[in-house]
């Protein structure tokens, strides 16, 4: 049975334990988050004036990498086919001053820069910048600008520390200071590595003897971070739904081939 236990959640990241799946599924979830969850990003730019020190192409690249809010309730983001919808972000600015992402004016109030304080270009006195940028839905597998964030996972392990080794109390103290769950019995201390725990060099001689690591089967610690386009928990939900839809499509096609 698949279980998810949330360890920590902030506005821009979530850490959870995924239990009851093999490494193939864990990696499929990671790849789906990075490559399949759609977001809005600038895909084309029409420049009308650009007197700045930067070429059009450089500004266009900077615009493409600005995270844009992507409304979950308006678009079927877990669909295998994306909506053909374009948002126009316009700008008309004159120096002196710095042009920020918050200066972009969107024709859709729900699709706008997630962070208004990203600098785009510095304009000197008399310099002007006028353009229309066109954003559309896309997937990270086509370009990194559509990635909703970043994710990685590690095996969930337990480090067993024998009380027969000299200085075991120090390792217990270090683990607690690191914020790791610690269990203890009369023979050993057990540290659960919900995040990395590095054994000091002075204890290297005990590794494999008085100190050993147990890999918990089919259990992983996942970390997901959002760029701001989507709430972090929605990224995980959408990725899981996309995986389910792909599996359903695969099964249906197999049944069709079987006649």
UniProtKB/Swiss-Prot annotation:
Catalytic activity entry: RNA(n) + a ribonucleoside 5'-triphosphate = RNA(n+1) + diphosphate
A biological-process GO annotation: DNA-templated transcription
CDD domains for the chain: RNAP_D
Top-rank EC class of the record's enzyme: transferase
Keyword vocabulary terms for this entry: Cytoplasm, DNA-directed RNA polymerase, Nucleotidyltransferase, Transcription, Transferase
InterPro entries, per the entry: DNA-dir_RNA_pol_30-40kDasu_CS, DNA-dir_RNA_pol_insert, DNA-dir_RNA_pol_RpoA/D/Rpb3, RBP11-like, RNAP_Rpo3/Rpb3/RPAC1, RNApol_insert_sf, Rpo3/RPB3_RNA_Pol_subunit
GO MF, any single term: DNA binding
Single GO cellular component term: cytoplasm
Localization, UniProt: Cytoplasm
Keyword Transcription attributed: yes
UniProt-listed Enzyme Commission number(s): 2.7.7.6
Main subcellular localisation: cytoplasm
Entry similarity comment: Belongs to the archaeal Rpo3/eukaryotic RPB3 RNA polymerase subunit family.
Subunit structure: Part of the RNA polymerase complex.
The protein's role, per its UniProt record: DNA-dependent RNA polymerase (RNAP) catalyzes the transcription of DNA into RNA using the four ribonucleoside triphosphates as substrates.
Protein name (record): DNA-directed RNA polymerase subunit Rpo3
Lineage: Archaea, Methanobacteriati, Methanobacteriota, Thermococci, Thermococcales
Chain's gene name: rpo3
């Amino acid at each position: 049975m698949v279980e998810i236990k949330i360890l920590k959640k902030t506005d821009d990241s979530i850490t959870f334990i995924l239990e009851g799946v093999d490494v193939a599924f864990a990696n499929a979830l990671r790849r789906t988050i990075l490559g399949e969850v759609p977001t809005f990003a600038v895909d084309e730019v029409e420049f009308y004036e650009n007197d700045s020190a930067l070429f059009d192409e450089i500004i266009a690249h900077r615009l493409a990498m600005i995270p844009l809010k992507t409304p979950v309730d308006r678009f079927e983001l877990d669909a295998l086919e994306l909506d053909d919808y374009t948002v126009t972000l316009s700008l008309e600015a004159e120096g002196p001053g710095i042009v920020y992402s918050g200066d972009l004016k969107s024709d859709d109030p729900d699709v706008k820069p997630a962070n208004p304080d990203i600098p785009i270009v510095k304009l000197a006195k008399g310099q002007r910048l006028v353009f229309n940028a066109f954003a559309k839905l896309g997937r990270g597998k086509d370009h990194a600008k559509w990635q909703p964030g970043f994710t990685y996972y590690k095996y969930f392990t337990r480090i067993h520390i024998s009380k027969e080794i000299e200085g075991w109390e120090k390792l217990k103290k270090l683990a607690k200071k690191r914020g790791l769950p610690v269990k203890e019995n009369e023979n050993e201390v057990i540290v659960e590595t919900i995040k990395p725990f590095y054994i000091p060099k002075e204890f290297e001689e005990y590794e494999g003897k008085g100190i050993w690591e147990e890999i918990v089967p089919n259990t992983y610690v996942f970390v997901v971070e959002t760029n701001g386009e989507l709430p972090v928990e929605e990224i995980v939900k959408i990725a899981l739904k996309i995986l389910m839809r792909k599996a359903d499509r695969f099964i249906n096609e197999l049944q069709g081939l079987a006649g």
